[in-house]
């Protein structure tokens, strides 16, 4: 279609694109409109995941018999272990089928609900003040880092180099957690663990947002959503750990 048939379109001299399409980053070759559509889809999925997590976790927190069942019975303990392991197990087929509809959505639902139960059980034995503080700070941090990453990408910065460092830091964090389980070191060590976890997952939010802008293919919307959802949930749990230890 000729340009004169679309009077509302205007060449963007700065980016060299027609219709005023603005690139998300300087070396962008794909259509910004398609990439923005992909980004909106991923954030829509994350929003539904977070809403489901809030709904399930709130049910666990406010319906006290649920928390009591998990905390005081052997069956509840066994079910709690199953719920902790389920997200890890489901991630394997979810990664394999993340491009196959509707299996990917089914697995995503199972993954989200199981993780939401684990979050709910953590919150059930935490004061409301601490939960609110962690939730507010998580929201502020996630929004700030997301805006910063989009701005940095626009300016030409790239965060792909963070991948190996974050993975190494995550391994250290997991070893620290195992040590803490078998050899509890007290409140100070718990706060140190929470601070390290918060820093690491802040880095992962920047790293995964950068991948969302530049690297994920359009068929990888499920895996992109899972990555950022895990970053947000883990950041919340890390902040919850810090505030609980400081309370």
Curated annotation (Swiss-Prot):
Entry GO CC: membrane
Membrane topology of the entry: Multi-pass membrane protein
Keywords: Membrane, Transmembrane, Transmembrane helix
CDD domains assigned: GAAP_like
InterPro entries: Bax_inhibitor_1-related
Intracellular or extracellular location(s): Membrane
Highest taxon in the source lineage: Eukaryota
TM region(s), chain numbering: 42-62, 75-95, 105-125, 130-150, 165-185, 188-208, 222-242
Pfam family, one: Bax1-I
Coiled-coil residues: none
Similarity comment: Belongs to the BI1 family.
Protein's name according to its UniProt entry: Protein LIFEGUARD 4
Organism encoding this protein: Arabidopsis thaliana (Mouse-ear cress)
Upper classification of the organism: Eukaryota, Viridiplantae, Streptophyta, Embryophyta, Tracheophyta
